[in-house]
């Protein structure tokens, strides 16, 4: 569920059960730790309808639990309203970016800046690979990438 705030970010991946809910949970923890959570509206969504209504992948939940981060999300697809109401839409790979740019062209009042979350990575790992067909270590890689990128994004935007 999105929170009220003066800045807003929507994290997006293909199904909204692996990468984007991890990024959402990581960013929520960062803004909470920095005591700026009241200033942010944060959510995540999918470009597809494949997983709508499902909770995050259990491997991602296990990974986040290991790092002391609570994950509470139900997958949803991005809407036209999201493009008009979020300041930033941060996605995980080139396919997401193409889909989002195509969808944004169908929205008259798109205000969102659409970018790859990996563009904020100090280690220059531009793409956050989908761990769905991988193992627990792939989810750890996604967590570490999201942590680096979300920290850098928060520093740049706050």
Curated annotation (Swiss-Prot):
Enzyme class: hydrolase
Residues bearing the modification N-acetylalanine: 2
A Pfam family it matches: LMWPc
Family annotation (CDD domains): LMWPTP
Phosphotyrosine, modified sites: 132-133
EC number per UniProt: 3.1.3.48, 3.1.3.2
InterPro entries documented for this protein: LMW_PTPase (IPR050438), Ptyr_pPase (IPR023485), Ptyr_pPase_sf (IPR036196), Tyr_Pase_low_mol_wt_mml (IPR002115), Tyr_phospatase_low_mol_wt (IPR017867)
GO-annotated molecular function: acid phosphatase activity; non-membrane spanning protein tyrosine phosphatase activity; phosphatase activity; protein tyrosine phosphatase activity
GO cellular component, one term: sarcolemma
The reaction(s) this protein catalyses: O-phospho-L-tyrosyl-[protein] + H2O = L-tyrosyl-[protein] + phosphate; a phosphate monoester + H2O = an alcohol + phosphate
UniProt note on tissues of expression: Widely expressed with highest levels in brain and liver and lowest levels in muscle.
Subunit composition and interactions: Interacts with EPHA2; dephosphorylates EPHA2. Interacts with EPHB1.
Family per similarity comment: Belongs to the low molecular weight phosphotyrosine protein phosphatase family.
Role noted for this protein: Acts on tyrosine phosphorylated proteins, low-MW aryl phosphates and natural and synthetic acyl phosphates with differences in substrate specificity between isoform 1 and isoform 2.
Protein's name according to its UniProt entry: Low molecular weight phosphotyrosine protein phosphatase
